[in-house]
Amino acid sequence: NRYLEEEQNKNIEYENGNVEWMEEMIEEYGEDGISHSSYSSTLSEIAYFDGRYVSFCQQEYDYQGGAHGMPLWIGLTFDLETGERLSLPDVIANSEEELNSIVTEYFAEYINGNPEEFWEDALDIVRDEICFESDFYLTEDGIKFYFHPYALSSYAAGFPEVTIPYDEFEMKISLQSGEQEL
């Protein structure tokens, strides 16, 4: 798959840069002179698979020092017949305006249920940012939309997320869940 190959090459290039940096630090400070500890990790969790489509959340964590590292989620959905990565317009037929309205409604319910966890303007941010390029991935229960830490709330609140049932959308693709078509 072209996308995964490009990502793998980026990761290799990044890690080679880390090795080069560490070698420079060892040369400059000696093996005992480096006190900086950092690490990164990547985990991919399959959230949906039906033989035709696969969707997963790639969860990354990068710690470079300080109080905590930074997590990152990357939602990825592929058509296994074509090998192509799918975007929201490949999955749903709704307009961008309809998408924004549906997702904002679900986030409004979530935010209003826990208002103390969110920035005062969290719902405005959702309304302003939901579009065809929004972060998403497929699950058995629907399309999951999410924001990264600090986007709508504090780091401690994690990733604000909602899963919206497929029947809320005009689906372009036919998904299978066990024996039943979604």
Language-model regions, residue ranges each:
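Compositionally biased intrinsically disordered regions enriched in Thr/Gly
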Residues: 1-182
